[in-house]
């Protein structure tokens, strides 16, 4: 009786082992079938790629789509052949073999022209020649004077924390008035005018200290003050008025130099 039970247990175990072997064999066969199928698919893809000599990789294909928007760039065939110009042919004159009704792909959309708002905000320099053509000669001169005045006022606002006294404010106001009432358009012209009047004042100072005052005035004014008084009483007054103007400009220059040096020291 004991042997019968043992034999039955061995039979059940052998049956279980047989089923496990069958399942293991089937699993191994399925695994080998999957590997062989993947190898066949890979080989078939390689044959298809080698059969198409004009096929490109995806980045090159996208580049060609950007350069040729009308080329067929369908998502179903991302590696479709794109007509390529020969090496001895100029790419600018290469013919486009794509159909006329072909639509560009979403990866290579055509560039739309800028709107008017974008043109004004991003390319404001395009409108500059038109604005310049609107101005006449007189308007351009007034525009330059206004810009020079605004630049000086902006500099003064930037340096508003500087302790300016009343004389400095008066000097600044005189400079702005001079710009408005003269033909001076730039700081360089103002500096040149001040330098010329400085030399003239230097010469006039030597003339006043010289014992030959009348001869010096005759050389400068092409006539002596005494004769000028006899001939035209207002000419000598005009000469002294001009001299006073030169003195005023020189005082302005000196005050301006003091202000400039003080500004640099603060900075």
Curated annotation (Swiss-Prot):
Function comment: Essential for normal spermatogenesis and male fertility.
Organism of derivation: Homo sapiens (Human)
Keywords: Differentiation, Phosphoprotein, Spermatogenesis
Coiled-coil stretches noted in the UniProt entry, renumbered to this chain: none
Protein name: Uncharacterized protein C3orf62
Modified residues (Phosphoserine): 210, 224
Pfam families on file: DUF4712
GO biological process assignments: cell differentiation; spermatogenesis
Tissue specificity as recorded in UniProt: Testis. Down-regulated in men with spermatocyte arrest.
Taxonomic superkingdom: Eukaryota
Highest classification ranks of the organism: Eukaryota, Metazoa, Chordata, Craniata, Vertebrata
């Amino acid at each position: 009786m004991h042997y019968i039970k043992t034999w039955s247990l061995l039979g059940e175990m052998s049956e279980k082992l047989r089923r496990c072997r069958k399942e293991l064999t089937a699993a191994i066969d399925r695994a080998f079938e999957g590997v062989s199928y993947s190898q066949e698919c890979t080989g078939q893809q390689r044959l298809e790629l080698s059969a198409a000599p004009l096929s490109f990789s995806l980045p090159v294909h996208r580049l060609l789509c950007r350069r040729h928007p009308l080329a067929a760039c369908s998502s179903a065939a991302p590696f479709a052949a794109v007509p390529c110009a020969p090496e001895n042919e100029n790419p600018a004159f290469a013919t486009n073999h794509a159909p006329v009704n072909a639509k560009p792909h979403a990866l290579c959309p055509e560039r739309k022209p800028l709107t008017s708002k974008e043109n004004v905000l991003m390319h404001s320099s395009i409108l500059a020649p038109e604005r310049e053509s609107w101005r006449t000669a007189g308007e351009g001169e007034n525009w330059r004077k206004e810009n020079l005045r605004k630049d000086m006022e902006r500099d003064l606002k930037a340096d508003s924390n500087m302790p300016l006294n009343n004389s400095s404010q008066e000097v600044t106001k005189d400079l702005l008035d001079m710009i408005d009432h003269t033909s001076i358009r730039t700081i360089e012209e103002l500096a040149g005018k001040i330098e010329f009047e400085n030399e003239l004042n230097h010469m006039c100072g030597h003339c006043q200290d010289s014992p030959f005052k009348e001869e010096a005035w005759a050389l400068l004014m092409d006539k002596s003050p005494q004769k000028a008084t006899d001939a035209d009483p207002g000419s000598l007054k005009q000469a002294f008025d001009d001299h006073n103007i030169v003195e005023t400009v020189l005082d302005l220059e000196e005050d301006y130099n003091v202000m400039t040096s003080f500004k640099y020291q603060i900075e």
